């Protein structure tokens, strides 16, 4: 049987308000992660590693940095018709922007018609994980379903925070799609677990087009993929679930197999990066068999100075990107993005420091996120006194992580 022709659609229009101020000037999928990456690099790497090389990224909210990242990083040879391209809202169906994730695809159906795929893979743009989507596509074709939804096994209590998939006894056909239920249903054979929707879908093309057109004609619809399109197909008994725990990615270990993180809040974003700093992190960035691709700035290697016991530049349990200079400061459990400068006697402990931020002499940064081009003057403190941080106008998360926005000079 010949391989199906697959088109990838990546939904990247989210505003990410819970990640503010990191999303004040950028779309959520463009938020930096892990030193070198953007959140969108994870889904695009999964698709490209699988050989799916015709991908449209549907953008809308403050998309300039996201569009620039895609066009400079994800350049495919077009000799064989391959592409990764950002597609902004174009008002093809009238003078309005995208009204929801389903409307974004409906307004972009010209892409589907032009490419004429057998299968349309619709994935979200802002989760951290590895997945081989070929295995999900294979199950979809074998099942004969109109749509297959990726399901993540989570404890039932955690299911209250997700869209939840209820299946029949066979564990495959979806009987109900529940939005943040108070009492999530257990799984057949595993009653203490439930299926949380990952927001990843595989559609037979004709089924997707038909569902989108019906949804567009419904004035009461929210035009949302998870809230409207999937329930419509569930009612037709045309929806199946794909168990993410069955997915085997080359190079993964038993420890990081099945890893998936929604980093949509400041605390979850921070926690996922602190995990990367651990001696044995759950998520392995160093898997060469299924790499996470990105563009790396042309900067020199990281440097640590001085050879002086009173101010030795040192980084412990940390990720240090190219262009970083740790000049006599101490860094513990931190992710330092390219071009960061840590000066003498400075202390950086449990922090995410984004591109070109500068921490001055004797300054302290603790339990904090510094966005790009932040300047912490000599002797200043961030994250030490949360009440003082709030008084200075900085965001403090529910769990006490201080966030300083892009380009801010910290006041003493």
Swiss-Prot record:
Signal peptide: none annotated. The keyword ATP-binding applies. Its EC number is 2.7.7.27. The lineage of its organism: Bacteria, Bacillati, Actinomycetota, Actinomycetes, Frankiales. Keywords: ATP-binding, Carbohydrate metabolism, Glycogen biosynthesis, Glycogen metabolism, Nucleotide-binding, Nucleotidyltransferase, Transferase. It catalyses: alpha-D-glucose 1-phosphate + ATP + H(+) = ADP-alpha-D-glucose + diphosphate. InterPro entries: ADP-Glc_PPase, ADP_Glu_pyroP_CS, GlgC_bac, GlmU/GlgC-like_hexapep, NTP_transferase_dom, Nucleotide-diphossugar_trans, Trimer_LpxA-like_sf. Pathway: Glycan biosynthesis; glycogen biosynthesis. One of its GO terms (biological process) is glycogen biosynthetic process. GO terms for molecular function: ATP binding; glucose-1-phosphate adenylyltransferase activity. The keyword ATP-binding applies. Belongs to the bacterial/plant glucose-1-phosphate adenylyltransferase family. Alpha-D-glucose 1-phosphate binds at residues 163, 179-180, 197. This is Glucose-1-phosphate adenylyltransferase. Pfam families: Hexapep_GlmU (PF24894), NTP_transferase (PF00483). It comes from the Bacteria. Coiled coil: none annotated. Homotetramer. Involved in the biosynthesis of ADP-glucose, a building block required for the elongation reactions to produce glycogen. Catalyzes the reaction between ATP and alpha-D-glucose 1-phosphate (G1P) to produce pyrophosphate and ADP-Glc. NCBIfam families: glgC, PRK00725.1, PRK00844.1.
């Amino acid at each position: 049987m010949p391989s199906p022709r697959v088109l990838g659609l990546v939904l990247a229009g989210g505003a990410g308000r819970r990640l503010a101020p990191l999303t004040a000037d950028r779309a959520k999928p463009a938020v930096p992660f892990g030193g070198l990456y953007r959140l969108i690099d994870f889904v695009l790497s999964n698709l490209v590693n699988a050989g799916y090389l015709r991908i449209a990224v549907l953008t809308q909210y403050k998309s300039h940095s996201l569009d620039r990242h895609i066009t400079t990083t994800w350049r495919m040879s077009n000799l064989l018709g391959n592409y990764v391209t950002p597609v902004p809202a174009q008002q093809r169906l009238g003078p309005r922007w995208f009204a929801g994730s389903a409307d974004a695809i409906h307004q972009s159906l010209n892409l589907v018609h032009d490419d004429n795929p057998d299968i349309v893979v619709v994935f979200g743009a802002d989760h951290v994980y590895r997945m081989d989507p070929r295995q999900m596509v294979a199950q979809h074709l074998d099942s004969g379903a109109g749509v297959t939804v990726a399901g993540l096994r989570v404890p039932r209590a955690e299911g209250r925070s997700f869209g939840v998939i209820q299946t029949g006894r066979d564990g495959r056909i979806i009987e109900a799609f529940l939005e943040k239920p108070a009492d999530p249903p257990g799984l057949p054979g595993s009653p203490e677990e439930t299926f949380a929707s990952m927001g990843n879908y595989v559609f037979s093309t004709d089924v997707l087009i038909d569902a989108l057109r019906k949804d567009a004609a419904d004035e009461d619809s929210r035009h949302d993929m998870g809230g409207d399109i999937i329930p419509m197909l569930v009612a037709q008994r045309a929806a199946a679930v794909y168990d993410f725990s069955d997915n085997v990615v080359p190079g993964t270990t038993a420890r990081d197999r099945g890893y998936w993180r929604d980093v949509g809040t400041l605390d979850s974003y921070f926690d996922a990066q602190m995990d990367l700093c651990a001696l044995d992190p759950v998520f392995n960035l160093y898997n060469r068999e299924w790499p996470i691709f990105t563009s790396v700035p042309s900067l020199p290697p990281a440097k640590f100075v001085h050879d002086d016991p009173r101010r030795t530049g040192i980084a412990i349990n940390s990720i240090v990107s190219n262009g970083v200079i740790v000049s006599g400061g101490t860094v513990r459990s931190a992710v330092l993005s390219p071009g960061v400068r840590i000066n003498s006697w400075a202390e950086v402990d449990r922090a995410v420091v984004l591109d070109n931020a500068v921490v001055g002499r004797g300054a302290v940064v603790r339990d904090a996120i510094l966005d790009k081009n932040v300047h912490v003057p000599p002797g200043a403190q961030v994250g030490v006194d949360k009440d003082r941080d709030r008084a200075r106008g900085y965001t403090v998360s529910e769990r006490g992580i201080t966030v300083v926005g892009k380009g801010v000079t910290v006041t003493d």
